């Protein structure tokens, strides 16, 4: 996830250049796999939305997806849960040391699964937080959105 405070360019909004605007941009940052989320990504998204919700000088949130994909140049908002890590027990948390390694072999990946968190992909908790946030959450959709990504788009304002 990326989390940025928007900054004025000082042109048409009558705000001096470089001054913080009351808007936060939160973006999925896994463009190579259409911004699919993993359990750690869902945790980060929850923390980002909650931080913006609790910051008094933030008036709105923009939720989007980074891109383009280095594989084919395509853009995506979010393709939902990363099916490559979904096991028989559900989605699997990985240890921090392997969570960003896209090329780790499946057998090696299994050694790093956090056993106490098997099956836990709590996107519903993020959706509840989005609905309870009194600030508008704008879904800026740059391309594909499917599965859980589509649900986030629908829940946004």
Q: Which role does the model predict for each range below?
A:
Residues 1-71:
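Conserved CoA-thioester-binding segment of acyl-CoA-metabolizing enzymes
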Residues 15-16, 75, 129-130:
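Short secondary-structure boundary/capping segments
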Residues 42, 46, 120-127:
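Short, well-ordered alpha-helical scaffold segments within catalytic/effector domains
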Residues 33, 65-125, 145:
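Glycine- (often His-adjacent) and acidic-residue-rich active-site loop
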Residues 26, 63, 82, 152-154:
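Hydrophobic/aromatic residues within transmembrane alpha-helices
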Residues 122-157:
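Glycine-rich beta-to-alpha active-site loop
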């Amino acid at each position: 996830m990326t989390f940025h405070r928007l900054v004025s360019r000082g042109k048409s909004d009558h705000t001096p250049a470089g001054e913080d605007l009351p808007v936060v941009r939160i973006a999925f940052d896994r463009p190579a796999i259409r911004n699919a989320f993993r359990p750690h990504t869902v945790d980060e998204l929850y923390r980002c939305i909650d931080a913006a919700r609790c910051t008094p000088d933030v008036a709105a949130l923009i939720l989007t997806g980074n891109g383009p994909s280095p594989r084919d140049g395509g853009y995506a908002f979010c393709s939902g849960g990363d099916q490559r890590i979904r096991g028989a027990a559900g989605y699997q948390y990985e240890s921090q040391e392997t969570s960003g390694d896209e090329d780790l072999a499946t057998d090696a990946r299994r050694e790093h699964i956090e056993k106490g968190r098997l099956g836990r992909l709590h996107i519903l908790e993020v959706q509840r937080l989005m609905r309870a946030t009194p600030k508008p959450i704008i879904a800026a959709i740059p391309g594909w959105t499917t599965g859980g990504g589509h649900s986030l788009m629908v829940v946004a304002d």
